């Protein structure tokens, strides 16, 4: 069973600029850097990434889930318009304050903060990052009320706890996770996602 996210990868047209933005506005710190080994690039079926520079960043405190930024990316990339991994969801302390802090940065505000359900337990905001990657910045008032029950983070901007995936066939995707990883599944649940709706307006 898959239990914890250890690291996520994003492609960046400018790794140095991305590092600075994550450091200045998310409070993340660089923990390593290097180039993508050919063997690894082949293993993930992305041979074009072999030899590309990367750096890995972690939140200041709390659970250490890395974001590995790899040189690459498509200038025409648009979040939510491709299948596969679409967004990174981070636990944050105060979405309202974070919205103010991100003004004038390379992070562009999209929606929120808004409560996602009538229970008013999950307050979330969506922003796009320096390379158009989509972030959900989420605060749970009481994590014990969520079926995920994530470990709280003491950092203003904490760790990745959800990855959002676009799928052309939800049933097939759920069956894949059930068959190969024995993960518990919830849903599918009908739900209107504002940033997804706007992407196709």
Report residues per predicted region.
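Polar low-complexity intrinsically disordered regions
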Residues: 1, 20, 24, 74-78
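Vicinal oxygen chelate
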Residues: 9-10, 31-35, 65-70, 89-90, ...
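Core segments of cupin and vicinal oxygen chelate
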Residues: 10-62, 115-118, 165-201
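Short N-terminal amphipathic alpha-helix/helix-capping patch enriched in small hydrophobics
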Residues: 4, 15-18, 126
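Eukaryotic phosphotyrosine signaling hubs
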Residues: 5, 83-87, 160-161
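Short, flexible turn/loop "capping" segments at secondary-structure junctions
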Residues: 1-2, 80-81, 153-157
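Post-signal peptide N-terminal segment of secreted/secretory-pathway proteins
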Residues: 31, 40-56, 62-85, 93, ...
């Amino acid at each position: 069973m898959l239990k914890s996210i250890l690291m996520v990868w994003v492609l960046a047209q400018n790794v140095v600029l991305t590092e600075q933005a994550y450091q200045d506005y998310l409070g993340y710190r660089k923990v390593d850097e290097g180039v993508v080994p050919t063997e690894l690039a082949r293993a993930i079926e992305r041979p074009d990434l072999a030899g590309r520079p990367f750096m890995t960043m972690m939140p200041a405190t709390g659970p250490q889930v890395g974001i590995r930024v790899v040189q690459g990316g498509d200038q025409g990339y648009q979040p939510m318009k491709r299948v596969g991994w679409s967004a990174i969801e981070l636990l944050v302390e105060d979405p309202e304050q974070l919205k103010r802090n991100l003004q004038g940065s390379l992070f562009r505000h999209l929606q929120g903060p808004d409560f996602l359900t009538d229970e008013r337990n999950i307050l979330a905001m969506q922003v796009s990052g320096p390379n158009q990657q989509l972030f959900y910045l989420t605060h749970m008032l009481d994590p014990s009320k969520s079926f995920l029950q994530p470990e709280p983070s003491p950092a203003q901007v904490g760790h990745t706890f959800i990855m959002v995936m676009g799928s052309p066939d939800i049933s097939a995707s759920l069956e894949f996770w059930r068959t190969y990883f024995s993960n518990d599944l919830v849903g599918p649940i009908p739900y209107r996602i504002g940033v997804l709706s706007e992407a196709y307006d």
